[in-house]
UniProtKB/Swiss-Prot annotation:
Matches recorded under InterPro entries: Aldolase_TIM (IPR013785), His_biosynth (IPR006062), HisA_bact_arch (IPR006063), Isoase_HisA-like (IPR044524), Isoase_HisA-like_bact (IPR023016), RibuloseP-bd_barrel (IPR011060)
Pathway: Amino-acid biosynthesis; L-histidine biosynthesis; L-histidine from 5-phospho-alpha-D-ribose 1-diphosphate: step 4/9
EC numbers on record: 5.3.1.16
PANTHER family assigned: 1-(5-PHOSPHORIBOSYL)-5-[(5-PHOSPHORIBOSYLAMINO)METHYLIDENEAMINO] IMIDAZOLE-4-CARBOXAMIDE ISOMERASE
Record-given protein name: 1-(5-phosphoribosyl)-5-[(5-phosphoribosylamino)methylideneamino] imidazole-4-carboxamide isomerase
Domain of life: Bacteria
Protein source organism: Acinetobacter baumannii (strain ATCC 17978 / DSM 105126 / CIP 53.77 / LMG 1025 / NCDC KC755 / 5377)
Length: 243
């Protein structure tokens, strides 16, 4: 299991939001490339990048920044989400050195797109499911749908998806702990590996996720930036008595 640092990009800066609200941001760095290097130095084995402006615009806004990070970290698996709505965008990111591309809103609006992407780019597609009270949210969390997160995950069980990034919006950026029950339930219901996101605050949250069936990793943002979680300590904890 991996602890994956999040680098959320807004207006060229590395920020953290609370519950996805663009107006409620905290800027942690003006240099995302240096931030990525910092987390690699701290032992990161994968990076989670989010183009926040892209998520709202429906098209990538931070391509040059993402490309620069990928170029600086050629050996490191990198996943990117936010504004990915076309096969051309996926191809561009993969050619630039990104390892995994996360499809979110488009997966809800057009599930067939995910299936086509998995055929074209096998092993490189992650579905991002963001949920409020178990219901899927889209367009940078601006719209909550009537689609259950578990049903959407199940829809892609046989599509060739690499994994699912599951974000509990109510917990995201709030430092209130991860929703272990919902995350594990999603993994068991879909049969797909799940990366937990939203609410990972301290080592207790990491312990609660460790060894849970179907959990591939956990994304953490505000906690490692504000110091309530030490990335290296968290990964060491997960590496102990690895199952």
């Amino acid at each position: 299991m991996l602890i994956i640092p999040a680098i959320d990009l807004k207006d060229g800066k590395c920020v953290r939001l609370k519950q996805g609200r663009m107006e409620d941001d905290t800027v942690f760095s003006d240099d995302p490339v240096a931030t990525a290097q910092h987390w690699v130095n701290e032992g990161a084995r994968r990076l989670h990048l989010v183009d926040l402006n892209g998520a709202f615009a429906g098209t990538p806004i931070h391509k040059p920044v993402v490309e620069a990070i990928a170029k600086a970290q050629p050996e490191l698996p990198i996943q990117i989400g936010g504004g990915i709505r076309s096969l051309e965008t996926i191809e561009h990111y993969l050619e630039a050195g990104v390892t995994f591309v996360i499809i979110g809103t488009k997966a809800v609006q057009e599930p067939e797109f995910v299936e086509e992407a998995c055929k074209r780019f096998a092993g490189h597609i992650i579905v991002g499911i963001d949920a409020m009270n178990g219901m899927v949210a889209t367009d940078g969390w601006a719209n909550v749908t009537d689609v259950k997160a578990t049903d959407l995950a199940k829809r892609f069980a046989d599509a060739g998806v690499s994994s699912i990034v599951y974000t509990d919006i109510a917990r995201d950026g709030m430092m209130q702990g991860v929703n272990v029950e919902q995350t594990v339930n999603l993994a068991q219901y879909s049969g797909l590996p799940v990366i937990a996101s939203g609410g990972v605050t301290n080592l207790d949250d990491v312990r609660n996720l460790k060894g849970q069936p179907g959990i591939l990793g956990a994304i953490t943002g505000r906690a490692i930036y504000e110091g309530t979680l030490n990335l290296r300590e968290a990964q060491l904890l997960l590496d102990e008595n690895r199952l």
